[in-house]
Amino acid sequence: MFDEQAIKQSVQNILVAIGEDPDREGLKETPRRVAQMYTELFSGMNQDPAEVLRVGYELGHREMVIIKDIPFYSMCEHHLLPFSGVVHIGYIPNIDGRVVGISKLARVVEIYAKRPQIQERMATQIADAIMDGLKCDGVAVVIEAEHMCMVMRGIKKPGSRVITSALRGSFHKSPAARAEFLSLIQHKG
């Protein structure tokens, strides 16, 4: 659970530390607003992706399943600034052909995105959760994102995108499976 009172007090302390008056008209409600925002932005902290993946269907489908361009936003754990982009997920069902509803994969993305996060770990967590939850033959995850910590501060390079991947099972072992996945996520239309 979140300690909203501690968040409010911390925001008030930051405002004072930067020389602002937390009681002035535009800032009076800021600590409360930030506490509510953090409760929403970090709601994945209290969610278990295994629960989302528990319900599936054994359809005998043995071919690659891909959902691409899943939009997300998250908060960089280094600066607490947002990063956002898209996630592409592919998996190859196991011998039973167990699949899940495609919205379940988007929910797994949301759970891991709504935590203080780094993009590399997020890709790994999504891939591991799907591999463990579906017991599939393979999982591929590619994340493309723009990080506000590179846009607003430091190097200040808007438009630069970070791409990370996590490959498990057949996607890690088979260059053909990996190439097919990468080709399909590049396909426009």
Swiss-Prot record:
Gene Ontology molecular-function annotations: GTP binding; GTP cyclohydrolase I activity; zinc ion binding
Top-rank taxon, per record: Bacteria
Positions bound to Zn(2+): C76, H79, C149
Recorded catalytic activity of this chain's protein: GTP + H2O = 7,8-dihydroneopterin 3'-triphosphate + formate + H(+)
Pathway of action: Cofactor biosynthesis; 7,8-dihydroneopterin triphosphate biosynthesis; 7,8-dihydroneopterin triphosphate from GTP: step 1/1
PROSITE patterns: GTP_CYCLOHYDROL_1_1 (PS00859)
Record keywords: GTP-binding, Hydrolase, Metal-binding, Nucleotide-binding, One-carbon metabolism, Zinc
Entry's Gene Ontology BP terms: one-carbon metabolic process; tetrahydrobiopterin biosynthetic process; tetrahydrofolate biosynthetic process
GO cellular component entries: cytoplasm
EC annotation from Swiss-Prot or TrEMBL: 3.5.4.16
Enzyme superclass (EC): hydrolase
Record family assignment: Belongs to the GTP cyclohydrolase I family.
Subunit structure: Homomer.
Name the UniProt record assigns to this protein: GTP cyclohydrolase 1
Gene, per the UniProt record: folE
